[in-house]
Amino acid sequence: MTRPQAAAEDARNAMVAGLLASGISVNGLQPSHNPQVAAQMFTTATRLDPKMCDAWLARLLAGDQSIEVLAGAWAAVRTFGWETRRLGVTDLQFRPEVSDGLFLRLAITSVDSLACAYAAVLAEAKRYQEAAELLDATDPRHPFDAELVSYVRGVLYFRTKRWPDVLAQFPEATQWRHPELKAAGAAMATTALASLGVFEEAFRRAQEAIEGDRVPGAANIALYTQGMCLRHVGREEEAVELLRRVYSRDAKFTPAREALDNPNFRLILTDPETIEARTDPWDPDSAPTRAQTEAARHAEMAAKYLAEGDAELNAMLGMEQAKKEIKLIKSTTKVNLARAKMGLPVPVTSRHTLLLGPPGTGKTSVARAFTKQLCGLTVLRKPLVVETSRTKLLGRYMADAEKNTEEMLEGALGGAVFFDEMHTLHEKGYSQGDPYGNAIINTLLLYMENHRDELVVFGAGYAKAMEKMLEVNQGLRRRFSTVIEFFSYTPQELIALTQLMGRENEDVITEEESQVLLPSYTKFYMEQSYSEDGDLIRGIDLLGNAGFVRNVVEKARDHRSFRLDDEDLDAVLASDLTEFSEDQLRRFKELTREDLAEGLRAAVAEKKTK
């Protein structure tokens, strides 16, 4: 007999001796119960024949669950079950188990379950990548082993706090063959949901782990998480009751004790984006903090808003004074941000702005573009512009006006408010002042002052009317640091605006064709009257300036559609053509003198009927 053969034979004898000392009968021999001898014999067997997988598994059976033993068993996996089958030892007699380090002991009954047990121990040893690769290489044939692979992969994700992956491993609808795996998986899914801030769903899912108390450790985790969910939603008394229950079940459950000792103790919340941003997928500390993630996201959105605001402002026709004022405020804001970054003092300034001029001259558009710029400069949190007016805020009683104003302003915090026709806030005709207007103004004043770092108020209206309204409350006048004037569009600007609005939908309005509108545009511009407050009101103001021009273009398109509704149109619709000649396209793009003249007539007629 060669030396290797002798060593293998000695290893088998040691294996038999170890099994007998473990209380397992072999070949009819009477077993004993001597764990120390069993462990020594199994160790001897693996030393003599490292390729005997069952000897390594026997060491697990004897209580040596070190990672080295599992590594040895996996290295010898080709001989899995050979020795026990040779000796006639059944699976019921020889059933090594390994703790997953969290909830369960995993029985090793197959090559795939050995891989799972080894992966669980690797994960406990923080050798996450090795565990993941081992699980990825496992292709279980038996449904029970397939469940075990899913479970251990869930354990790996749970240990590394990859919460979306935990939820993917333990979907609620899955029917588990092993109820213990289901309970432990539910506990991990509960923690995942709570850590992602889905508290109500986490609280509900926890019941799967708690009911029946199949896995006490899983039930403890689920109860603890329920308690923390209650704390996060402000139900502290109920939270403490659950935490005490956990502590009474397991006094060694440290998180419950910490949560009871410290009412400010909370779960660490995260989100899928932060988890995916990790530089090491297995290390939660390699991810940017939630604050850093939010800052990066905000910076990206800020750049977008700034670019959009600049583009919208630059695309507006005319309004050079308004553009200059906005650019000045933007420059001042940027300088103040730089001063703050350098540690220099920065005066607290408001950006509340009066936009004075007739309707339809771009006041709302400027307010929206400016708000986006302020978002881009991180002065405001959101590009929201809440449009309101006296009519929208009034209620049946004076208290309604105050309440409606407060609710509107609360919703606008972080963004802006656009008060249309702000000069109507305070109306004449009341013997002791306008109580409704005063209620709105007083509430507005509080927010303009106390929230000037997170709210911008735009007041729009005619100049002289606004001046008289502001005389009622000098405090309101002082809150507006910027005044921008808007003017009626001149005839040539109205022509340019007509062409610009046509281009928005790839319509063609030539300079020559558009001249049909010039006499009327000039007439509307030259018509003048004065309001009761002394504001100059031109005919084009009464029509609506840009709003009127848009209506002219829309009515002109309607006339073109009627003009084109002929046999040629029917032929185009009936054909299978997908490409058309320039001549064909021109018919559907150009607005003729007749179209524009009819559009003007229809727009004026519509205005007169309103």
From Swiss-Prot:
It is found in: Cytoplasm. Part of the ESX-5 / type VII secretion system (T7SS), which is composed of cytosolic and membrane components. SMART domains: AAA (SM00382). The gene is eccA5. Keywords: Acetylation, ATP-binding, Cytoplasm, Nucleotide-binding. It comes from Mycobacterium tuberculosis (strain ATCC 25618 / H37Rv). ATP binds at residues 357-364. InterPro entries: AAA+_ATPase, ATPase_AAA_core, CbxX/CfxQ, CbxX/CfxQ_RuBisCO_ESX, P-loop_NTPase, T7SS_EccA, T7SS_EccA1-like_N, TPR-like_helical_dom_sf. Part of the ESX-5 specialized secretion system, which is responsible for the secretion of EsxN and a number of PE_PGRS and PPE proteins, including PPE41. EccA5 exhibits ATPase activity and may provide energy for the export of ESX-5 substrates. Belongs to the CbxX/CfxQ family. This is ESX-5 secretion system protein EccA5. GO terms for cellular component: cytoplasm; plasma membrane. Pfam families: AAA, T7SS_EccA1_N. GO terms for molecular function: ATP binding; ATP hydrolysis activity. PANTHER family: AAA-TYPE ATPASE FAMILY PROTEIN / ANKYRIN REPEAT FAMILY PROTEIN, AAA-TYPE ATPASE FAMILY PROTEIN _ ANKYRIN REPEAT FAMILY PROTEIN.
